[in-house]
Amino acid sequence: MAKEGVEKAEETEQMIEKETSKEPAEGGDGSHRLGDAQEMRAVVLAGFGGLNKLRLSRKAMPEPQDGELKIRVKACGLNFIDLMVRQGNIDNPPKTPLVPGFECSGIVEALGDSVKGYEIGDRVMAFVNYNAWAEVVCTPVEFVYKIPDDMSFSEAAAFPMNFVTAYTMLFEIANLREGMSVLVHSAGGGVGQAVAQLCSTVPNVTVFGTASTFKHEAIKDSVTHLFDRNADYVQEVKRISAEGVDIVLDCLCGDNTGKGLSLLKPLGTYILYGSSNMVTGETKSFFSFAKSWWQVEKVNPIKLYEENKVIAGFSLLNLLFKQGRSGLIRGVVEKLIGLYNQKKIKPVVDSLWALEEVKEAMQRIHDRGNIGKLILDVEKTPTPLMANDSTETSEAGEEEEDHEGDSENKERMPFIQ
C-alpha cells in the first residue's frame, strides 16, 4: 500500500509538471486560454517537503462568488508561516496540490453578488485563505481593504500580516502604554520592524530586540537596545533593566518561552505568535519539533498567579478564518492606515522576486537573511539564472530531489507508528 501511495503521488506531480510546460495562447487582456477556459499563472505546492515541491503552473482563473471580490494581483507577501506550510509543519495542513500565500495587493477586477463599498478599479490589499501566490485571487469582501493612493503595491503586500499582527499584540492584547518596555525576537524581520515602528508611536517606550549580528547595522536605529540572537540576552536585558520588561513578543518558542517568562515584570505579558525554532532543515524534522516542544517550560498557573504574569498566544490567520473576527481586524487596519497616512509607519520591503524565483525567495526566509518583508512581484521579469519556471528535472525527466535537512547535523529519528 505504501508503494502504491508513493506511485500515485509521483503520478500527480508528473501531471502538474506537464501542465506547467504547456504554453497556452495569450488573450487580449493578458490572460491565457486553454480551450474556452481562462487561465492564470500560480505557484503550486505539489506536496509537502523541500523547495523542489514548488513550481510555477497554470490554473483556471477563479471567478467571484456571492460576497467575494476578484483581484488582479500585483504583489504577494512571503511569511515564515508559508515556509512552515510548505514543510507541512502546521496543525491540520490542507491537501496538496495547493497554491500557498495568505496576503496580496492588487486591483479589483470583478464584484460578486451583494458586494458593496467597492468598485472595479479600486486599489486594495487583502487576506486570502491560501491561493494568494497567483495572478488572480477571489476572497470575501470582509478580508479586503482599500489602500492609500501613495502606498505602492509592494508596500501594501507587506502591510497586512506584519502590521496587523504587531498592532494586535501590542495594543489589543498587551495594552502598550507610555513608559513601558518591549522585548521582540527577530527584530529585523517584517513583524519585528512593524513592532519597532508601532512602539515609536507611544512616548518613552523602550524596545529590546534580538537579531542576527549581520542585521544590526541596518536596524540599530529602529530599537533601543539590540542583542545577538545567539547571545545570553536574558542577562543583557536584566543588566539594563533589573526588573525585566513589560511585554515579550516571541516568534521562536522552544527554550525562549521560559526565558521570556523569566524576564516579565509583575503584570507583564508574554505572547507567543510563532515557532520558527522548529524549522531547521529544508524539510520537516520530527527531531526539531520534539526538541522545541521539550524545551518549552511547563507553565504552572499557580506560579502565574503568584508572580502576577500573563501568558497569551496569537494567531492572526485563526482569528480571521476560523474564529470570525474580521470586524475586529478591520478596525485595526483602519487605525494602521491612519498611522501610515500620518507618516508614522511604513512597511520595510527587503526585496522583490518574480513568481519564477519563489524558491530563492523562500530560501532567503529560511536562512533568516531578510530585513523586512520579501515580496513576490507578479509583473517582475525573473533574472536569467532563475528563470527556470521554478522546476528542476533530471535527465530521466523526473524531479531532482533536493538534499533535505541540516547537512552538518542531520538527525535520524526512528519511525513512530
UniProtKB/Swiss-Prot annotation:
Q: Where in this protein does the record put region Disordered?
A: 1-33, 382-417
Segments of skewed composition (Basic and acidic residues): 406-417
The regions listed as transmembrane in this protein's record are none
Q: Where is the composition biased (Acidic residues)?
A: 395-405
Domain of life, per UniProt, equals Eukaryota
Which CDD domains does this entry report, sorted A to Z?
MDR3
Name of one Pfam family that matches: ADH_N
Please state the Enzyme Commission number of this protein.
1.-.-.-
Q: Which PANTHER family match?
A: SYNAPTIC VESICLE MEMBRANE PROTEIN VAT-1 HOMOLOG-LIKE
| Name listed for the protein in its UniProt record | Synaptic vesicle membrane protein VAT-1 homolog-like
Its gene is Vat1l
